[in-house]
């Protein structure tokens, strides 16, 4: 196991702890109250901030990913330590997201210091969609790897969470999950050439999504649904309305009924082509990629949903400095958050090697922007 600790990190830890305590003392709302306010369209005390940090947590705390990949205890410990440094209002920690598919026997690469990658299709042939069933995420005997990579980590972090950061259930979205199982290019071809086949694949995938989300949501505070294949960069509005929206809407309805949680929906790339339809899914907050103009997004969705984003994760958060981060963060707030209904974050997951100080700089902007 590789663990790095130095005086610089210790000094940052002490400084961040003091600053976070000062900010917390100035807060007039809890994180849960703040989230509820932005969803309802009420003004919170300040701008909430989400670090969208996953593998970043392991790297920042001095660990190689292979030592964290399936270790819930270590993952929980370093996530809590990381959050003490950054002060994020939300956390989900270092999840090995391809584990969602490993119990199916698909090939998944396992690089030492990066996420695994799904390398093979579960539904390679058309007839596989009907013949090959998926595992039951709520049955521990059928979902061993999914639990090791995702659910066990979520549950372990909740037990040690000392900062009050909000925790989430997690699963890939429906069309993204179907893309992993069928292959994205094959699935997109199915939507055009064999739509009934595409619907069958997505319908089965939606049941897997539902189970994975429910397996990790008990005791949580919100739900996080990344659905990158739903991007307007990949599909058009008509495809989104037919093959993603109705399935996502049904899941969201069920989750809200059973958990009462707010739903954060993240879509990569350009979502402007599908933006007007996204609120129809029933989600509460769209986490927007850095590729879009938040002001344009706000104009399209109005007050139907809250927006989240979208500081450039590479150019600014990873490679920028404190001044660049402050300017970019304020630009995001002014574009979409002057009247509330907004969470400040990166415009996608924070890159692995992003300095803690840069993440902290974004946190400080949100925590100092009061209403």
What spans do the regions from the language model cover?
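Compositionally biased amphipathic helical and low-complexity segments enriched in hydrophobic
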Residues: 2, 13-15, 83, 135, ...
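Glycine-rich, N-terminal phosphate-binding loop and its surrounding beta-alpha-beta segment
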Residues: 79-107
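Conserved FAD-binding subdomain of flavin-dependent enzymes
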Residues: 75
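Intrinsically disordered, low-complexity segments enriched in small/polar residues
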Residues: 2-8, 103, 114, 162, ...
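N-terminal amphipathic/basic-hydrophobic helices that include classical n-h-c signal peptides
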Residues: 1-25
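Active-site loop segments of alpha/beta catalytic cores
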Residues: 20-21, 26-59, 63-68, 78, ...
């Amino acid at each position: 196991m590789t663990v790095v600790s130095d005086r610089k990190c210790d000094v940052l830890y002490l400084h961040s702890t003091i600053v976070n305590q000062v900010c917390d003392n100035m807060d007039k709302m809890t994180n849960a109250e703040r989230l509820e306010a932005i969803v309802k369209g009420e003004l919170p005390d300040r701008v909430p901030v989400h670090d969208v940090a996953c593998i970043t947590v392991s790297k920042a705390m001095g660990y190689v990913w292979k030592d964290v990949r399936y270790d819930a205890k270590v993952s929980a410990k370093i996530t809590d330590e990381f959050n003490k440094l950054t002060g994020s209002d939300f956390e989900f920690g270092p999840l090995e997201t391809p584990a969602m598919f490993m119990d199916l026997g698909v090939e998944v690469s396992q690089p030492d210091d990066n996420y695994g990658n799904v390398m093979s299709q579960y539904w390679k042939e058309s007839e596989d969609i009907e013949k090959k069933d998926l595992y039951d995420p709520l049955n521990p005997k059928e979902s061993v790897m999914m639990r090791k990579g995702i659910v066990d980590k979520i549950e372990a972090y909740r037990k040690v969470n000392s900062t009050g950061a909000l925790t989430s259930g997690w699963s890939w979205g429906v069309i993204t999950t179907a893309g992993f199982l069928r292959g994205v290019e094959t699935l997109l071809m199915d939507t055009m050439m064999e739509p009934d086949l595409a619907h069958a694949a997505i319908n089965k995938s939606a049941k897997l999504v539902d189970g994975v989300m429910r397996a990790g949501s008990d005791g949580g505070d919100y739900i996080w649904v990344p659905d990158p294949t739903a991007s307007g960069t990949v599909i058009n509005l008509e495809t989104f309305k037919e093959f993603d929206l109705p399935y996502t809407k049904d899941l969201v309805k069920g989750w809200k009924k059973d958990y009462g949680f707010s739903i954060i929906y993240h879509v990569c790339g350009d979502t402007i082509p599908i933006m007007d339809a996204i609120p129809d899914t029933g989600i509460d907050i769209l986490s927007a990629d850095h590729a879009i103009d938040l002001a344009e997004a706000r104009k399209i969705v109005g007050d139907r949903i809250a927006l989240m984003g979208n500081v450039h994760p590479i150019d600014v958060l990873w490679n920028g400095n404190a001044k660049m981060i402050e300017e970019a963060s304020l630009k995001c707030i002014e574009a979409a958050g002057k009247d509330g209904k907004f969470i400040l974050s990166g415009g996608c997951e924070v890159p692995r090697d992003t300095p803690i100080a840069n993440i902290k700089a974004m946190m400080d902007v949100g925590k100092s922007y009061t209403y």
